[in-house]
């Protein structure tokens, strides 16, 4: 039964990821006054499957100077971690109901750094190594703010369990009392998923695709799938943390539809930002985090810690 439930989570997530690639190309196409994919199938709907067929039927290449075991393990690890992150997510009922669901997501997402580092180092290419080093520094840095923002949210909901966040937001979204945190969280998720304007790790103009330059065929497709799964996952998590819908046990499908619509809107915002903004310089990216986001998130976290103590000391009014 668990395997059936696992497949019912993984397969729709993979289908969503496939159509996200098509949505991105369509959105970017229309924003640049062109059509985007429209040949394969009606309105280009079969384009993701054609891309997958092309990539997985190409000959897998292994560079002669590469460290083969790490080189082959890295793409599989990237996709596995992206899929593993879905297990504690309530949609409305999670696959596995952890008491420490948010901590699990934070710890597992930080493991994705290893796949990027291994791929950059094992490829034995200077471009790949520079891309990997940038990715590691960027991801680890932005995880600091993500963790502090999550801590602030936990202080408001009172539990590490993701289901309790839905209960907390029955009457009002957490977006309203903590909108500065939500804005910083969204910007940090852009950097965490290596998306524009924070896609320094695979800057085509200077690093020729970055850490995955030596990858081709199926292994490249696995990295690509892992990246897009992370985008959907991060937006689903943002929806759960800041925009959760009220859950009615009699009609669970209304929660799922609401959840999917919000995640889709946030994902479209990711694509819109990619079309609209140029890439940051690396020092600007780090300056934004360490000089701006970190002091702000720490100050807000201290505010949320001190507020209950402050209000409990006020005597009752007659």
Curated annotation (Swiss-Prot):
One term under GO cellular component: mitochondrial inner membrane
Class of enzymatic activity (EC top level): translocase
Primary location group: mitochondrion
One family name in Pfam for this protein: NADHdh
GO biological process, one term: mitochondrial electron transport, NADH to ubiquinone
Catalytic activity: a ubiquinone + NADH + 5 H(+)(in) = a ubiquinol + NAD(+) + 4 H(+)(out)
This protein's record includes keyword Translocase: yes
UniProtKB keywords: Electron transport, Membrane, Mitochondrion, Mitochondrion inner membrane, NAD, Respiratory chain, Translocase, Transmembrane, Transmembrane helix, Transport, Ubiquinone
Enzyme Commission identifier(s): 7.1.1.2
PROSITE patterns: COMPLEX1_ND1_1, COMPLEX1_ND1_2
UniProt-recorded Gene Ontology molecular function terms: NADH dehydrogenase (ubiquinone) activity
Transmembrane feature ranges: 2-22, 69-89, 98-118, 140-160, 171-191, 222-242, 253-273, 285-305
Family statement: Belongs to the complex I subunit 1 family.
HAMAP family, alphabetized: NDH1_NuoH
PANTHER family per UniProt: NADH DEHYDROGENASE SUBUNIT 1, NADH-UBIQUINONE OXIDOREDUCTASE CHAIN 1
Protein name: NADH-ubiquinone oxidoreductase chain 1
The gene coding this protein: MT-ND1
């Amino acid at each position: 039964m668990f395997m059936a439930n696992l497949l019912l989570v993984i397969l729709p997530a993979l289908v969503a990821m496939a159509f996200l690639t098509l949505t991105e190309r369509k959105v970017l196409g229309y924003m640049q006054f062109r059509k985007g994919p429209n040949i394969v199938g009606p309105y280009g709907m079969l384009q993701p499957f054609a891309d997958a067929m092309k990539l997985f039927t190409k000959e897998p290449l292994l560079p002669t100077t590469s460290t083969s075991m790490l080189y082959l393990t890295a793409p599989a690890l990237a996709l596995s971690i992206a899929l593993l992150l879905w297990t504690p997510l309530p949609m409305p009922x999670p696959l596995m109901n952890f008491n420490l669901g948010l901590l699990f997501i934070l710890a597992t997402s930080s493991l994705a750094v290893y796949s990027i580092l291994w791929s950059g180092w094992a490829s034995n290419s200077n471009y790949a190594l520079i891309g990997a080093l940038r990715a590691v520094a960027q991801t680890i840095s932005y995880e600091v703010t993500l963790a502090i923002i999550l801590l602030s949210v936990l202080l408001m909901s009172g539990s590490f369990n993701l289901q309790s966040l839905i209960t907390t937001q029955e009457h009002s979204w957490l977006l309203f009392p903590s909108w500065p945190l939500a804005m910083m969280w969204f910007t940090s998720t852009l950097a965490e998923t290596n998306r524009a304007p924070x896609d320094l790790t695979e800057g085509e103009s200077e690093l020729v695709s970055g850490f995955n330059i030596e990858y081709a065929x199926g292994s490249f497709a696995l990295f690509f799938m892992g990246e897009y799964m992370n985008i959907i996952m991060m937006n689903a998590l943002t929806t759960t943390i800041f925009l959760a819908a009220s859950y009615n046990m009699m009609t669970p499908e209304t929660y799922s539809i609401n959840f999917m619509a919000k995640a889709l809107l946030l994902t479209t915002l990711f694509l819109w930002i990619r079309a609209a903004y140029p890439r940051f310089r690396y020092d600007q990216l780090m300056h934004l985090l360490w000089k701006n986001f970190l002091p702000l998130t720490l100050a807000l976290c201290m505010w949320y810690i001190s507020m209950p103590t402050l209000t409990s000391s006020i005597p009752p009014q007659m």
